[in-house]
Amino acid sequence: MKPFYLVAALLLTNLHAADIELTETLQLPECHSLGWVRANTQVKGQKNWDGVLDEAKWGTPSPQQAVERSWDWKLTDEQWQQAVKEKGEGKKEDVKFDLWVPEEATVAKGIVVMSGHGSGENLFKHPELRKIARELHLALFKFVGNPMQRGFWPRSLLYERLKTFGQRAQHAELDHAPLFLYGHSNGTGFSAIFSAESTRVWGWVSMRPGTTYQVYQPSAAQIPGLIIFGEVDDFFGRPSKAENMGVVEAMRKKHNALWNYAVEPKTGHGPGDKTWPRVFSFLRHTFAARVPADTDPLKGAVKLHALTLESGSLGKNWDVTQGGYQTLTTAPFASFTGDKSTASWLINPAYAADWQMFQRDGQITRH
């Protein structure tokens, strides 16, 4: 890896003079990107899952279509390294990394990590997210650049950057702090697929997945996940809205996934101002439920709280035939009367109320 260019700046403002912001730009080869991995390793031919959701609704996909729908890859770092040796690492491109640590976080209890693909750039700078980070003592970390922003291999690439940034920021806890992941569109190739391999992740978000089949990750089933679709997003309509929702419902039914999804009415492929409170509610509630209150990543790896299906609430899924804003029933797991196997899993009653309000009103108005 070539020597990198590092810019470090203390944000000298009247209110928060000790906030830390670090920026680093590296040139990385394209062999790290998921596109290269699909094209140059054996994962494209794997059949860990056949891609069939409901033959009664959509028929049996062709063998080629089924393989293309399977993103549940089994690829070791050694196999990836061998493929790079045989095929070459490809051209190099810039990848920019940014870290922000609030003054209040003398020890960061967690890191919100986001791909800068799409809306990730704006999320990193969002005032409300930074307010939450100050309150919960979280660091924010972002990366953008073709070798990584749509997902990457190997997973250690992120861990290496977090460790390096932790050393330079004098926040060594970044080497072990729990992670919350965000990916927009095909940035889902980061947030969903990375979650399947990391015991450090306390929750993850896929915002308007470009390819919804990327979220079919059985190994991530027990990590709380949120998928948000835009009702008029062209990607949501391919091949159909029902089939895209069906990917999440299949994970719920086949793997008891602790996941929920929402459909934001009258919106397209990008989130808006009313979308972010939905994400922030999920971040807050999952952090409280999974990250121990006395966590200290300076002492090493953090053991996150495991959650059970029965401990949460359930919510009736959005009706694609009705469309628009809908009042969807929620109830504790034991008393929910709908289809428990496919309903959205909601971490607690307070989060369930936010989920319900968002689907009914298109926004969360409580504070």
What would you call each of these model-derived segments?
Residues 106-111, 136-141, 175-179, 198-204, ...:
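Loop/turn elements at helix/coil->beta-strand transitions in domains of secreted/extracellular proteins
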Residues 202-280:
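The feature captures the conserved acid-bearing segment of alpha/beta-hydrolase catalytic domains
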Residues 115-118, 167-170, 184-186, 195, ...:
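Cell-envelope and extracellular/periplasmic
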Residues 256-257, 265-367:
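Alpha/beta-hydrolase-fold serine-hydrolase catalytic core, especially in secreted/extracellular enzymes
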Residues 17-110, 182-194, 356, 360-367:
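A domain-start/cap signature at the N-terminus of enzymes
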Residues 104-107, 151-189:
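Gly/Ser-rich "nucleophile elbow"/oxyanion-hole loop immediately N-terminal to the catalytic nucleophile
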Residues 110-111, 117-160:
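Active-site machinery of serine-nucleophile hydrolases
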Residues 3-13:
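Sec-dependent N-terminal signal peptides
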